[in-house]
């Protein structure tokens, strides 16, 4: 019971609980009198991050300007849910502007064009049709949705929303150009962009992906604690012992699966026996088969990422895939009096790039002045220290170490490192171990999420039954060959056919996805039959 309660307490400490958070200005008459003192931020960040930055920023504003400010956090879910909110709100806001302020007809062409990031506008507006005019008008307007900042999530959703026109340059780089020098915040590290070339979004802390491990659970299964590698998650001995999160609910989770694909593509390319295109195609297939094996071992696909380390720590699963923040946070929360923790986190060597969690000012921000102040604080050394300083250090968090790595290179030296919770994790020194190639999988990011849903999540029962049959019958070669058939989700199909499907209306996307899922259901059923029909004496590498 005590163990369960400690895990539950740790989970509550990390999870966002937005319905319990009441705006402070509802209880503070000083703030209620002045809406200009309220900053609205939409975020997927955890309650601990929101709490610590609220406390630190409010203190900063009191000390520097004598102002009482409040942050109203909006937490609809992960980045996927935030994107849906922004799409809905900006569509409604621009429709109102277009119809009621400009007096123009709202048509399907206008709706499809105004936020289309792939829409090509001519330089001159003389020959604009309604679609061109809508896109140009939106990009020149100050149409807002009552939110000032988008804070947290991976670089990809920020790039998408910048392309749509939702994000704008805050002007921070103009005021502080020295912060964006190579020696402080480089624009790119290991192939990952650290900020937008137009400064519409700026990375403020770093993230890597890795594996959280319960060594007691591995002992129970007779597995020696290995050097973490993505292939560990596909070990047949970990059947129903792997905790995964749903990539359709989070761009961050999708990014983790993208790391697996990129690592396999790099390994094949580095062999040197194939040209680049053939190597990428083979690496993609190998990566997809690894992802499906990991999916076959999955105990579940959680709707929120923080469940993964919580369940691994509790022994409900032996290992899990998670972002470094969750792994390190639970490692700290579950330490005993001697400093030992039943949860360990590690990033596979050469298995993950170092990417950023950005922040951006939204178009039409109602309180752009206060939003700028928050961003300025966030990128100052004082704000950056908050990410990984220990509780009790000067400039550190008040209640809980956030265990996130700051984006500023100039903090990874003394005297700052002495105060870090993770002083030995030096991301800029390890960046050359993995190079992210956006040209390889960047265009396939949406397809990766879509494919995993169609071949792992939707037919999960059939996938697990096939995998169990392979395990029970010692991986007969014909059944393994049938399992490894990824001809319906090749690299070429992902970049072509599936990418095209994802540009169509949601109904057509769903129809294609159901067909893909049904194909793999039948494939997994066939694998199960083949495995059970084998006498099990002939084995195959798996």
What function would you assign to each model-found segment?
Residues 122-151, 163, 167-212, 231, ...:
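A structural signal for short loop-to-beta-strand junctions that line the ligand-binding cleft
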Residues 426-542:
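Conserved C-terminal helix/tail region of periplasmic/extracytoplasmic solute-binding proteins
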Residues 4, 18-159, 309:
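Early extracytoplasmic/lumenal segment of secretory-pathway proteins
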Residues 40, 231-252, 260-267, 276-279:
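Short loop->beta-strand "edge-of-pocket" segments that line small-molecule binding or catalytic clefts
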Residues 179, 184-187, 207, 244-245, 288-294, 377-402, ...:
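Periplasmic-binding protein-like
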Residues 212-217, 354-369, 386-387:
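A bilobed periplasmic-binding-protein/Venus flytrap-type ligand-binding module shared by bacterial periplasmic
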Residues 130, 259, 263-339, 385-386:
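Ligand-binding pocket segment of bilobal, Venus flytrap-like solute-binding proteins
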């Amino acid at each position: 019971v005590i163990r369960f309660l400690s895990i539950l307490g740790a989970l509550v400490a990390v999870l966002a609980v937005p319905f319990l958070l009441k705006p402070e200005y509802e209880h503070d008459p000083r703030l209620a009198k002045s809406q200009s003192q309220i900053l609205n931020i939409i975020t997927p960040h955890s309650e601990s991050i929101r709490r610590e930055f609220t406390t630190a920023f409010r203190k900063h504003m009191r000390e520097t300007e004598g102002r009482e400010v409040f942050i109203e956090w909006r937490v609809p879910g992960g980045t996927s849910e935030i994107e849906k909110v922004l799409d809905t709100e900006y569509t409604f806001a621009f429709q109102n502007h277009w119809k009621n302020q400009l007096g123009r007809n709202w048509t399907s062409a206008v709706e499809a064009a105004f936020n289309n990031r792939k829409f090509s506008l001519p330089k001159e507006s003389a020959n604009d049709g309604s679609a061109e005019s809508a896109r140009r008008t939106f990009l020149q307007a100050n149409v807002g949705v009552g939110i000032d900042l988008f804070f947290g999530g991976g670089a990809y959703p920020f790039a998408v929303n910048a392309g749509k026109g939702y994000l704008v340059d805050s002007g921070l780089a103009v005021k502080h150009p020295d912060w964006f020098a190579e020696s402080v915040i480089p624009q790119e590290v290991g192939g990952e962009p650290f900020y937008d070339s137009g400064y519409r979004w700026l990375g403020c802390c770093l993230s890597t992906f890795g594996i959280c491990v319960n060594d007691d659970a591995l002992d129970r299964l007779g597995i020696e604690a290995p050097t973490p590698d993505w292939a560990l998650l596909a070990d047949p001995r970990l059947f129903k012992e792997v905790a995964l999160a749903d990539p359709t609910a989070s761009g961050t989770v999708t990014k983790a699966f993208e790391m697996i694909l990129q690592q396999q593509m790099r390994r094949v390319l580095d062999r040197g026996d194939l040209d680049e295109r053939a190597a990428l195609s083979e690496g993609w297939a190998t990566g997809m088969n690894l992802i499906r094996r990991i999916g076959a071992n999955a105990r579940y696909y959680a709707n929120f990422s923080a469940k993964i380390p919580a369940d691994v720590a509790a022994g409900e699963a032996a290992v899990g895939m998670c972002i470094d923040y969750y792994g390190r946070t639970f490692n700290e929360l579950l330490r005993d009096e001697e400093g030992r923790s039943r949860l360990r986190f590690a990033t596979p060597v050469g298995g993950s790039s170092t990417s950023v969690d950005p922040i951006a000012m939204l178009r039409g921000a109602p309180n752009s002045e206060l939003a700028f102040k928050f961003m300025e604080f966030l990128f100052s050394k004082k704000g950056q220290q908050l990410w990984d300083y220990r509780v009790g250090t000067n400039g550190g968090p008040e209640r809980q170490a956030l265990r996130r790595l700051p984006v500023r290179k100039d903090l990874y030296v003394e005297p700052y490192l002495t105060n870090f919770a993770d002083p030995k994790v030096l991301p800029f020194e390890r960046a050359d171990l993995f190079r992210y190639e956006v040209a390889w999988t960047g265009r396939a990011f949406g397809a990766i999420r879509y494919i995993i849903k169609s071949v792992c999540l939707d037919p999960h029962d059939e996938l697990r039954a096939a995998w169990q049959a392979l395990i029970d019958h010692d991986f007969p070669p014909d059944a393994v060959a049938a399992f490894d058939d990824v001809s319906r989700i090749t690299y070429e199909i992902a970049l072509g056919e599936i990418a095209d499907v994802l540009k169509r209306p949601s109904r057509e996307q769903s129809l294609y996805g159901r067909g893909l899922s049904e194909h793999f259901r039948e494939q997994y059923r066939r694998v199960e039959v083949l495995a059970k029909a084998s006498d099990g004496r002939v084995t195959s590498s798996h």
